[in-house]
C-alpha cells in the first residue's frame, strides 16, 4: 500500500483511486474548471481523487505542437489548484533538474514511459522520497518492469505505483494485455497497479504530426481493465476534446465524467467484494 497523503492510500485490494485531470495545462482557468468537476463528481461518488496535468509535454511528435506553460508557471497553477480544492497532485518530470522543485509542490511524481529506463532520472526521482508513478513503456513486457522497480529500490525509494498505458502492436497501434496486470503484480511484489485508459486509446496516422485516438471506446476499455482488480484509474477529460491542445482524440468529454465514473466505481466495488481466489 502506498500512502499518497494523510487520507488517500493506493492498493490493489482497496477501492480504486482516480488519477484524473487534463492532459496538459492549457490555462489556469481550464485547470480550475476541470478540477472543480472532478472534485464534484468524486466527492459525490466517494472516489479518492488525485488531480493530474502536465506542465511540459516534452515528447510531442512535432516541434510545432503545444507543450505547455513550462515548469515555473505550471507549479504556480498547481499551487492554485491545491489552495482552491485541497487535492493532491500528480505530474510528470522529464529532466533531472525538475525533480526537486516539482517535488516541493506535487504529491506524486511521474516517470514518463519513454524515459522509464533512464537511470539518472530514476535515481533523481527516487531521491525526492515522494511516491513515483512509473509508466510502463509501450515497448516493455510487464515482467520487465521489475528491473525498473529494482533501480528505484536500490536508489532508496520503494514508494512506487506502476501504470500500464498500452503495448505496441505492430506499427502505429496499442493494445492492452489484460493478463499483464497480473504479471506485474506477481513480479513486482504486488505494488499498486493503475491503468491509463486514455493513452491506451491512442493510435497514429503514419503521416500525421499528432497522435489519434479512440475515445468512443473508453468505456469498454476502462471496464475491461478495472475488472481485473486494480489500485487506480488514470484518466484525462476535457470540456471540448476536439479543441484540446494535446491528445483530444483520446480524452473523455468532461460532461460524461459522472456517468462514466459511476459505472467504474460500481464495477470496482463488485470485483473487490469477491473473496480472493488463487489457482495454482
From Swiss-Prot:
The keyword Oxidoreductase does not apply. SUPFAM superfamilies: Aldolase. GO terms for biological process: keto-3-deoxy-D-manno-octulosonic acid biosynthetic process. It is found in: Cytoplasm. It catalyses: D-arabinose 5-phosphate + phosphoenolpyruvate + H2O = 3-deoxy-alpha-D-manno-2-octulosonate-8-phosphate + phosphate. One of its GO terms (molecular function) is 3-deoxy-8-phosphooctulonate synthase activity. Its EC number is 2.5.1.55. Belongs to the KdsA family. This is 2-dehydro-3-deoxyphosphooctonate aldolase 2.
Amino acid at each position: 500500500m502506498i500512502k499518497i497523503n494523510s487520507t488517500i492510500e493506493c492498493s490493489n485490494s482497496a477501492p480504486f483511486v482516480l488519477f484524473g485531470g487534463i492532459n496538459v495545462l492549457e490555462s489556469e482557468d481550464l485547470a480550475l474548471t476541470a478540477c472543480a468537476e472532478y472534485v464534484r463528481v468524486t466527492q459525490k461518488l466517494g472516489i479518492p481523487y488525485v488531480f493530474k496535468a502536465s506542465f511540459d509535454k516534452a515528447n510531442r511528435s512535432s516541434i510545432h505542437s503545444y507543450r505547455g506553460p513550462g515548469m515555473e508557471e505550471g507549479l504556480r497553477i498547481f499551487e492554485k489548484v491545491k489552495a482552491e480544492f485541497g487535492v493532491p497532485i500528480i505530474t510528470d518530470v522529464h529532466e533531472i533538474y525538475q525533480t526537486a522543485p516539482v517535488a516541493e509542490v506535487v504529491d506524486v511524481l511521474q516517470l514518463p514511459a519513454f524515459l522509464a529506463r533512464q537511470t539518472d532520472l530514476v535515481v533523481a526521482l527516487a531521491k525526492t522520497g515522494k511516491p513515483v508513478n512509473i509508466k510502463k513503456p509501450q515497448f516493455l513486457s510487464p515482467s520487465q518492469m521489475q528491473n525498473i522497480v529494482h533501480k528505484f529500490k536500490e536508489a532508496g525509494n520503494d514508494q512506487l505505483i506502476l501504470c500500464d498505458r498500452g503495448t505496441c502492436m505492430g506499427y502505429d497501434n496499442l493494445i492492452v494485455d489484460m493478463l499483464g496486470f497480473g504479471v506485474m503484480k506477481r513480479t513486482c511484489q504486488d505494488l499498486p497497479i493503475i491503468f491509463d485508459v486514455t493513452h491506451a486509446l491512442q493510435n497514429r496516422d503514419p503521416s500525421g504530426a499528432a497522435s489519434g485516438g479512440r475515445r468512443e471506446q473508453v468505456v469498454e476499455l476502462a471496464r475491461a481493465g478495472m475488472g481485473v482488480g486494480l489500485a487506480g484509474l488514470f484518466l484525462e477529460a476535457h470540456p471540448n476534446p476536439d479543441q484540446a491542445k494535446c491528445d483530444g482524440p483520446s480524452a473523455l468529454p468532461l460532461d460524461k465524467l459522472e456517468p462514466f465514473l459511476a459505472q467504474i466505481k460500481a464495477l470496482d466495488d463488485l470485483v473487490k467484494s469477491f473473496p480472493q481466489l488463487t489457482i495454482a
